[in-house]
Amino acid sequence: MRIINLFILSFILLPLSADDHKVMPGGEVGEFHYIKAKNPLAIVAATDKFIASDCGQKWQAKSRGLVLMQLDGSGMSHFFYSGFDDYESMNEAIQLASSCAAGLEFVQAIGDASHGEYYFNRIGELSLQKGDWTKDSVFLKYDLFVDPMKRGDYAKAWSSLVESQDTPGSSGLVTHVTGNGRVSHFAFNGGPSVPELMSGAEETFSSKEFLEFAAEVDEYRTVVNVMMVTPVKAWVKE
């Protein structure tokens, strides 16, 4: 888990508060590439090969890291997440990977090892976060649609709920910039293990604060799906 923990730590642009109960700005933008794998081992091998290439090393220098996540509770099997400090770094990395042979071979290899007709991607911003991701090895991911006119209200209500809970693991709210017609955001909660993650979720859902939160946001927030997310492998700058 050490490489995953280092990857997660590298994603945090702003230093975390000593108070793990405080919600802070995330300060990061990223790409989410969703796939339905036919051969997960081939997908990992193709990523290893790309990252080891000269082009991959240059791409990695522009990014905060790349991680492959496994999904349970979704029609897709995995997603890649690549994080960046800002849109300028993202643009430079995209231009680099799309103009080198190793990058094009990587895309082809991922296509060969997955069901290409199911692929989709989104760009998202880590708008808010609480806690230290490096202590987490599994996550619950809540795909949401929030009324555009109420998104500020939702962020405020979500922050209040998260800060009221004394559960293990991190929390975050990601705002989709593209691909947001059906899912405008996702929220996540992390934990050190599946039992602790589920126990924390049960504790939150049975709390007075959650009942108040649900009543407040019910008219403008829809939960589209809930998934469990497990890091498979991360590729980070040495």
Stretches with model-predicted labels:
Residues 9-17:
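Hydrophobic h-region of N-terminal signal peptides that target proteins for export
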Residues 18-238:
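Short S/T/G/P-rich N-terminal loop/turn motif that feeds into the first structured element of a domain
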Residues 1-9:
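Sec-dependent signal peptide recognition
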